[in-house]
Amino acid sequence: MRDDRALNVTSEIGRLKTVLLHRPGEEIENLTPDLLDRLLFDDIPYLKVAREEHDAFAQTLREAGVEVLYLEVLAAEAIETSDEVKQQFISEFIDEAGVESERLKEALIEYFNSFSDNKAMVDKMMAGVRKEELKDYHRESLYDQVNNVYPFVCDPMPNLYFTRDPFATIGHGITLNHMRTDTRNRETIFAKYIFRHHPRFEGKDIPFWFNRNDKTSLEGGDELILSKEILAVGISQRTDSASVEKLAKKLLYYPDTSFKTVLAFKIPVSRAFMHLDTVFTQVDYDKFTVHPGIVGPLEVYALTKDPENDGQLLVTEEVDTLENILKKYLDRDIKLIKCGGGDEIIAAREQWNDGSNTLAIAPGEVIVYSRNYVTNEILEKEGIKLHVIPSSELSRGRGGPRCMSMPLIREDL
């Protein structure tokens, strides 16, 4: 790894050096039962405890020598580079919030510019803006009066603490993702401004393997780096096959790339199998946690450069078990550790609470949720070192330690 790289991730298990998190904010307290479906939540976490749990997560990372960065802080610092950038950010944020009324747009621009501190402004954008907070706004237009019942001008963004999905670090570049739903696609604006304008990343020659303006969807939970040569991507409830092809073309044909193969895993389209990383994560060189429902046989498509057609892909279908596919492409024996030990009831319960969603901070060393005690005991018996974090409230969002983190730098294996 070059020391001047702003980003470097070539595996799932290389020692973690720098990670991006988002500490849950007031957006959680703007959730109501009526908004759960709209905002893609199943329950309402208790913010005070969720923050305590998240702080324990961050402290665990720091104690392991990991530099912890926060999305909200980097976003605020990125727009401090110039007033032009800040105004562009505000305008784009309002447009993507779906604000139709011109009078309302003007009121929001004035409101956001009233914050003397950019961090406070970003926090408010993430939390959501209620109509009653715009003190000088009067509901005079037909649009505003007809839409008077809904309380928010800008919806809260409660999924932000799952920083894995809006973008993903691959090699020394990123996929700036187009999320499946409008609710979550708004989240990617923060990464856009961070990687284009923050002093830490600006001018660092960071390639974008995928862009948020693409029309098909791609989410970071479906992107797993199996080695410096092999990227796995799930074709799932949230990621389209067309997106996998776009990503593969850019990644495999980039002049400085180490990647040679993209493996597209077709997984069941359901809430429990939302992303590839909800059913399958790497914990050591040869060990993976899996949901029993993903062991296969699976449909997997190997995408490689077409030697006879420059710029095109060769797509090879393989139908085999997960173990055999991993063994073939990683060239080693593989141990699959089943969530819940394979017990049907325990596996379903612990899978619902992300028992298969671990974050490796080094080979054979992972962070896990305390509530998945059966899976955790099995991992320990397999020689995996565990860092167990509290999870009663964080887990209500249906994401585990991997979902809540975006590695920016890992040591190469």
From Swiss-Prot:
Gene3D superfamilies: Arginine deiminase, L-arginine/glycine Amidinotransferase, Chain A
Enzymatic reactions: L-arginine + H2O = L-citrulline + NH4(+)
InterPro entries: Arg_deiminase
Record-listed E.C. numbers: 3.5.3.6
Pfam families with a match to the protein in the record: ADI
Domain of life according to the entry: Bacteria
GO MF terms, alphabetically ordered: arginine deiminase activity
UniProt subcellular location: Cytoplasm
GO biological process: arginine catabolic process to ornithine; arginine deiminase pathway
This protein's name: Arginine deiminase
Organism: Clostridium perfringens (strain 13 / Type A)
Gene it is expressed from: arcA
